[in-house]
Design a protein with these regions (language model features):
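N-terminal "assembly arms/tails" that initiate or stabilize quaternary assembly
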Residues: 1-85, 380
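Short acidic, glycine/tyrosine-flanked loop/strand segments centered on an H-E-D-like triad
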Residues: 76-103, 328-330, 336-341
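Structured, hydrophobic secondary-structure cores that serve as assembly/anchoring elements
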Residues: 47, 52, 58, 87-103, ...
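Beta-strand elements of well-folded, non-transmembrane domains
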Residues: 57, 97, 368-372
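Extended assembly-interface regions of large multimeric machines
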Residues: 51-56, 60, 65, 76-78, ...
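Alpha-helical scaffold segments that mediate packing/assembly in large oligomeric complexes
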Residues: 102-178, 195, 251, 256-257, ...
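Sequence/fold signature of self-assembling virion shell proteins
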Residues: 2-37, 151-174, 197-396
Length: 396
């Protein structure tokens, strides 16, 4: 915590510098769910804007018996490097006539608390968006009324019938084991959204496993363990869902039959607003080249009938939310240490010179550098699923 600096151009006491810095960091930590499972490293001193992680290869099995008195050839170690450019983030708030330089100020403290939470959410989102790009993915199968399963191959097919189940958890854990992914004290970790956790908690296998077991929480946000996986809940777990297509509506209605690359709709759209978007027409995902106020120009020819419903295709079936549940092995990804390169900046009244001639303004803010990178893609598995709340939750 001593590396969190409070910088001013005025005469803040050493006590206040330390206090505000600690407040910022402590309020950031609860939001940093995605960072707590990363391999951390410090900001490189004199290393420019690039941070580097070393990735070591494995040795082959040494199956050749040793010969007495003969020293065998040793094995070399392969080392590769993963680099990421550092980026700087920050925000501030201007306060009028409120900063007291002689004591801890309640208003500034409250603002610092808010900025600490904002910093945590910002840097956590940067990390989340990076590690959600892993290439290993499983789509939750559709659970039919008779209990049978139907395989799903695309995100846009996922809906409320594609929940995260105990069986799917076991499948994900097995996949990580087969890749020899290291564990966190013998367990893997899954970061999931509360909407997904709701469904999992109602799974009979989860209920049976937690009926008598006393939970031991090791991680912030942990809700329980199943099949060798510890589950950590956060509202910042990734949700994939497209935005509204027309005003506040997530649907459009085909106004007539179509069998080519244009579809006339009944609603009035903002001209050009859907260019570059993806839509679902009769369950087929297609890109939008452009739109008038009543017509979609699509990348491919499609067939639809008057009255067919058109949905956003960036999420799940019928435009619903899809949740990215991250199953993680130890060392899968790396981040910059939060306690380095992060500052809370308090500028008291009178520090701005001619820019504030009447000494009316003070400011409180934060800035920091951050970077995240996947180190071992095979140690991260993303399970994409729907939930009971797929019709309600929005993208984040």
């Amino acid at each position: 915590m001593s590396n969190i600096n409070t910088q001013t151009t005025g005469a803040l006491s050493a006590e206040m510098k330390t206090y505000y810095g600690m407040e910022l960091l402590e309020n950031a930590k609860p939001a940093l769910v995605h960072n707590q499972f990363a391999a951390t490293r410090g900001v490189p001193v004199g290393g420019g804007k690039t941070v580097e992680w070393r990735k070591f290869g494995s040795f082959e099995k040494a199956l050749t018996p040793l010969t007495e008195g003969v020293t065998p050839d040793g094995s070399g170690i392969s080392v590769s490097y993963i680099t990421k450019e550092l980026s700087q983030y920050g925000d501030y708030t201007t306060v009028s006539d409120m900063l007291d330089l002689t004591a801890i100020d309640d208003v500034v403290l409250e603002i610092t608390d808010r900025h600490g939470a904002n910093m945590g959410l910002t840097l956590d989102t940067v990390t989340r968006n990076e590690i959600q790009q892993g290439t290993k993915v499983i789509y939750a199968p559709t659970i039919n009324a008779d209990g049978s399963e139907t395989e799903v191959l695309h995100r846009y097919e996922l809906g409320k019938a594609n929940k995260l189940t105990a069986a799917l958890v076991a499948r994900a854990a097995t996949a990580l084991k087969k890749m020899n992914a290291p564990t966190f004290d013998g367990k893997y970790v899954c970061i999931l959204h509360p909407s997904v956790a709701f469904d999992l908690r109602n799974d009979p296998d989860w209920i049976a496993a937690h009926q008598y077991a006393a939970a031991t929480e090791l991680f912030s946000g942990e809700i329980g363990e199943l099949h060798g996986v510890r589950f950590v809940e956060t509202t910042e777990a990734k949700i994939f869902r497209g935005k509204a297509l027309c005003q506040d509506s997530f649907t459009l209605t085909a106004a007539n039959n179509a069998a080519n690359g244009t579809v006339t709709v009944s609603e009035k759209m903002a001209v050009g607003a859907l260019a570059g978007r993806q839509v679902l027409v009769n369950g087929v995902k297609v890109g939008v080249l452009d739109n008038t106020d009543s017509m979609l120009m699509l990348e491919d020819n499609i067939t639809c009938a008057a009255g067919d419903i058109i949905y956003p295709a960036e999420g799940g079936a019928e435009g619903g939310a899809v949740y990215g549940c991250l199953f993680i092995g130890k060392g899968a990804y790396g981040v910059i240490d939060l306690s380095e390169g992060t500052e809370v900046i308090v500028k008291p009244r009178g520090s701005s010179g001619t820019a504030d001639p009447l000494d009316q303004r003070s400011s409180v803010g934060w800035k920091g550098v951050h970077a995240a990178a996947i180190l071992y893609d095979e140690y991260i598995l993303r399970v994409e699923c729907g939930s009971s709340y797929s019709e309600e939750d929005m993208a984040n």
